[in-house]
Amino acid sequence: MKKLGFLSLLLLAVCTLFACSNQKNASSDSSKLKVVATNSIIADITKNIAGDKIDLHSIVPVGKDPHEYEPLPEDVKKTSQADLIFYNGINLETGGNAWFTKLVKNANKEENKDYYAVSDGVDVIYLEGQSEKGKEDPHAWLNLENGIIYAQNIAKRLIEKDPDNKATYEKNLKAYVEKLTALDKEAKEKFNNIPEEKKMIVTSEGCFKYFSKAYNVPSAYIWEINTEEEGTPDQIKSLVEKLRKTKVPSLFVESSVDDRPMKTVSKDTNIPIHAKIFTDSIADQGEEGDTYYSMMKYNLDKISEGLAK
């Protein structure tokens, strides 16, 4: 009996110690800055700067369209609890069904106090024939120089909210900017070597304007932005007629859109689809393109490869 009593006390002590340890860890985790990012690209850039210093939640799932999204209860909860929220801005989450505008309003969050546009400072490009607020092209991250601006804005806000980890954020930012800068330089050299008559990136959505400007590669598309009609017969006909006047060797289709319209274009022009590329999302974890850096490297490699045919 004494032996049983001793074992019971020992078991109780171990359980108590384990519970206290878990409580301590939970308390430690709860002390971390709670950060929400609207999509996988912004979340990955944030992760590269913050590492394990924050508790990070990404709203729009990998592979989904961030233009028009319906937040889940978990997204609403995390946004309400967040110390800091990062969104793209320039008409991405606030255009279309304006899902982000509704989300932060319901969570009683204030702009430039609780939530910040990571695109602040980007040289904005507008939709074709437009130059007014609400008509911006949101895909600024497809220019690596803008990706660097995103990273700098994220680091700035993290330091403001969490000055105790300033040294970590600054160190990680420096290393990340150097990495993106090297890839940007490599990209410019690659596209300089492609013959001008072959230089045109053809995609479903007209989301490569920033890419085109940065790397001197004109773009063409079926529809301009995912909030409008996608892949109508007139849109397809217009692109087919344009391509028949060119020597473009390859077409591309985005990983987050229906590939059927581009397959029709390919059939009607006899121009092959060279590869799927990334635009609004990174890849699933463990797959090629599962970070912002690797997504951009994959795109640059596939596009230059396809146009060099």
UniProtKB/Swiss-Prot annotation:
CDD domains with a match to the protein in the record: PsaA
Cysteines paired by S-S bonds: none
ATP-binding found in the keyword field: no
Lipidation (S-diacylglycerol cysteine): 20
Residues in the signal sequence: 1-19
Binding annotation for a divalent metal cation: 67, 139, 205, 280
Membrane topology summary: Lipid-anchor
The entry's keywords: Cell membrane, Lipoprotein, Manganese, Membrane, Metal-binding, Palmitate, Signal, Transport
InterPro entries reported for this sequence: AdhesinB, Bact_metal-bind_prot9, Lipoprotein_PsaA-like, ZnuA-like
Gene Ontology, cellular component aspect: plasma membrane
Example GO biological process: metal ion transport
Localization in the cell: Cell membrane
Main localization, broad class: membrane
Lipid attachment points (N-palmitoyl cysteine): 20
Keyword Hydrolase among UniProt keywords: no
Pfam families in the record: ZnuA
A molecular function (GO) term: metal ion binding
Family recorded in the similarity comment: Belongs to the bacterial solute-binding protein 9 family. Lipoprotein receptor antigen (Lrai) subfamily.
Function as written in the Swiss-Prot or TrEMBL entry: Part of an ATP-binding cassette (ABC) transport system involved in metal import. Binds a metal with high affinity and specificity and delivers it to the membrane permease for translocation into the cytoplasm. Also acts as an adhesin which is involved on adherence to extracellular matrix. It is an important factor in the pathogenesis and infection. May contribute to the formation and accumulation of dental plaque.
Subunit text: Homodimer and homotrimer.
Protein name as annotated: Metal ABC transporter substrate-binding lipoprotein SsaB
Source organism of this protein record: Streptococcus sanguinis
